[in-house]
């Protein structure tokens, strides 16, 4: 998740250098952003594969057949998508950042991914008094 975001673009570039297809969950409204990223990185639809879905839905809104099709094809799930806008409502932040992360973990389990990588901001730690080490 988050392939078209600031960090995601750099991660996708590095993953593509490994020579294996990269699957990117992308909102239907962001498919053009993924096309632009393909152009920038010299990727094709076969090397940078769009998985249109919704972070807020179970299995990202994919059908059981679509989930089954992805089993065994994805070893690592990288979850970068989040709402960082502090002006966003608490409900919107919860749906994206809490429920979305839960959905990403469950999706990784559903497709049999062996590794789940979550990238977030320091805000994910909540209120903390002290020094992060």
Predicted regions and their residues:
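Conserved Rossmann-fold NAD(P)-dependent oxidoreductase catalytic core, especially the SDR/UDP-sugar
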Residues: 76-80, 87-95, 99-133
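Glycine-rich, N-terminal phosphate-binding loop of Rossmann-like dinucleotide-binding domains
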Residues: 26, 80-81
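N-terminal Rossmann NAD(P)H-binding glycine-rich loop of SDR-like oxidoreductase domains
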Residues: 1-20, 24
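Residues at the starts of beta-strands that form the adenosine-phosphate
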Residues: 20-21, 47, 114-115
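Flexible cofactor-recognition loop at the NAD(P)H-binding site
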Residues: 5, 82-83
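Short, conserved SAM-binding/catalytic segment
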Residues: 32-45
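Conserved Rossmann-fold cofactor-binding substructure of NAD(P)-dependent oxidoreductases
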Residues: 42-76
């Amino acid at each position: 998740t988050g392939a078209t975001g600031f960090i995601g673009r750099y991660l996708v570039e590095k993953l593509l250098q490994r020579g294996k297809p990269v699957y990117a969950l992308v909102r239907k409204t962001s498919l053009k952003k993924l096309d632009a990223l393909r152009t920038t990185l010299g990727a094709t639809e076969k090397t940078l594969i769009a998985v249109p879905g919704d972070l807020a839905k179970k299995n990202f809104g994919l059908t059981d057949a679509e989930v089954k099709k992805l089993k065994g094809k994805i070893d690592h799930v990288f979850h970068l998508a989040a709402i960082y806008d502090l002006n966003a409502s608490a409900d919107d932040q919860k749906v994206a950042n809490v429920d979305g992360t839960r959905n990403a973990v469950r999706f990784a389990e559903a497709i049999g991914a062996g590794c789940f990588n979550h990238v977030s901001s320091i805000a994910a730690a909540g209120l903390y008094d002290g020094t992060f080490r």
